[in-house]
């Protein structure tokens, strides 16, 4: 797993073109109207839809106010620095409503559930499930064959760049609504109980619980059976 350097991310955001993409439904005498070089217009007779940058389309609408009877603008961001990740080529199961920003790495057969938010520079290992409404912060790194329970927070760090993000090693199970704070490393095969707040490193193959989280026992067969990772859920 390759973690992006914080300064690389900062430079990426600084240098990126800030964008306000819009979708405009337009009606009127549209023949001959040029909505801009970077816009895509799908016009049929007196109605159409235009996709493009607001800074390019807005002056066109104003300049052609006498020809345009009405229009409706759909916009979901303003001066956005980071696009969403293009997931079409990723060999993973990604459900509707997951928000995954660009420069995120997702391993094969991972599962990203509805409402999950994964920030720039994060790494999701092969076969790992990110459950509903999980937040994985910038540069948060999660290993292979993990389960991150619904509503959990894997804290990320972009600034200050010297700070360390969370690292979750392979085969870890994190219960619902747990919080793993910045700089914590969760060891291989560990289990974090639901609702725990983890403020220090977790050794491999232990169970931690509470606020703040403390080791309550070593992993045993009973714990393994209760936290088994089912590969059937990860098959494509």
Swiss-Prot record:
Biological process terms from the Gene Ontology for this record are:
diaminopimelate biosynthetic process; lysine biosynthetic process via diaminopimelate
Top EC class, one word = transferase
Q: Which UniProt keywords apply?
A: Acyltransferase, Amino-acid biosynthesis, Diaminopimelate biosynthesis, Lysine biosynthesis, Repeat, Transferase
Pfam families reported in the protein's UniProt record: DapH_N, Hexapep, Hexapep_2
Q: Does the keyword Transferase apply?
A: yes
EC number(s) given by UniProt: 2.3.1.89
From the UniProt record, list the reaction(s) this protein catalyses: (S)-2,3,4,5-tetrahydrodipicolinate + acetyl-CoA + H2O = L-2-acetamido-6-oxoheptanedioate + CoA
Pathway where it operates = Amino-acid biosynthesis; L-lysine biosynthesis via DAP pathway; LL-2,6-diaminopimelate from (S)-tetrahydrodipicolinate (acetylase route): step 1/3
Q: Which InterPro entries match?
A: DapH, DapH_N, Hexapep, Hexapep_transf_CS, Trans_hexapeptide_repeat, Trimer_LpxA-like_sf
Q: Which GO terms describe its molecular function?
A: tetrahydrodipicolinate N-acetyltransferase activity
**Can you tell which superkingdom this protein's organism belongs to?**
Bacteria
The entry's function note states:
Catalyzes the transfer of an acetyl group from acetyl-CoA to tetrahydrodipicolinate.
Family assignment from sequence similarity: Belongs to the transferase hexapeptide repeat family. DapH subfamily.
Protein name as catalogued: 2,3,4,5-tetrahydropyridine-2,6-dicarboxylate N-acetyltransferase
State the organism of origin.
Answer: Brevibacillus brevis (strain 47 / JCM 6285 / NBRC 100599)
Q: Which gene encodes it?
A: dapH
């Amino acid at each position: 797993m390759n973690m992006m350097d914080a300064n690389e991310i900062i430079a990426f955001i600084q240098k990126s073109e800030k964008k306000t993409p819009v979708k405009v439904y337009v009606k009127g005498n549209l023949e001959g109207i040029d909505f801009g070089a970077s816009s895509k217009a799908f016009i049929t007779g007196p109605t159409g839809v235009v996709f493009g940058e607001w800074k390019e389309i807005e002056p066109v609408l104003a300049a052609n106010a006498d020809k345009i009877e009405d229009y409706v603008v759909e916009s979901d961001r303003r001066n956005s620095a980071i696009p969403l990740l293009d997931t079409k080529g990723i060999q993973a199961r990604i459900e509707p409503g997951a928000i995954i920003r660009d420069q995120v790495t997702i391993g094969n057969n991972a599962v990203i559930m509805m409402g999950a938010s994964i920030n720039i520079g994060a790494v999701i290992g092969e076969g790992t499930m990110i459950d509903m409404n999980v937040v994985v912060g910038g540069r948060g790194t999660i290993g292979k064959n993990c389960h991150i329970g619904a509503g959990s927070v894997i804290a990320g760090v972009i600034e200050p760049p010297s700070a360390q993000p969370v690292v979750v090693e392979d085969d870890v199970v994190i219960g619902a609504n747990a919080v793993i704070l910045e700089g914590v490393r969760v060891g291989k095969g560990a289990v974090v109980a639901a609702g725990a707040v983890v403020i220090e490193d977790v050794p491999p193959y232990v169970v931690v619980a509470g606020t703040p989280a403390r080791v309550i026992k070593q992993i045993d067969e009973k714990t393994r059976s209760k936290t088994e990772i089912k590969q059937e859920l990860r098959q494509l």
